[in-house]
Amino acid sequence: MLISDRDIRAEIDSQRIVLEPYDPAMVQPSSVDVRIDRFFRLFDNHKYAHIDPAEEQPELTRLVEVEGDEPFILHPGEFVLGSTYETVSLADDIAARLEGKSSLGRLGLLTHSTAGFIDPGFSGHVTLELSNVATLPIKLWPGMKIGQLCFFRLTSSAEHPYGSGEYGNRYQGQRGPTASRSHQNFHRTSI
């Protein structure tokens, strides 16, 4: 069940949802706004002939930090990784979903391509999959609102929450935009 602002504040007060830094002004009727950090991962398209999810490709992306009060310019058709300014930690019976902001979507900014779900037990910065589908560059200002987290109460605590190691925990504790680690547990069914 999606939880309300009142319940979000109660879960934050009891430390079952932890957002650091926490700004009470970011709480909305059924979500909490999150801001973008100053770190981005850009794809180096000339390092590999193709992307292979089964292989480790350590030079596929490079980390860039925006300096001072400058924006990051996301060009039309460009895809980069960013991350939330906030660290997010969830109790074993709370999951979250990252959604974009309508006002930014109307400008052509997609906040996440596919990975908007955050498992119970997760702790770390949330990696953003940012795409510009507009025809003009978009300025991304560190500290600006970039999305919103909606929280869900599970019917019971997860038997193996994220970070327990049972189902994998490749991104537990991540800081900044984290490149894909799909090669670590790549699965392919022979068909």
From Swiss-Prot:
Purpose of the protein: Bifunctional enzyme that catalyzes both the deamination of dCTP to dUTP and the hydrolysis of dUTP to dUMP without releasing the toxic dUTP intermediate.
Protein name: dCTP deaminase, dUMP-forming
Complexes and interactors: Homotrimer.
Keyword Nucleotide-binding in annotation: yes
Disulfide links within the chain: none
Biased composition (Polar residues): 171-183
Top-tier EC class: hydrolase
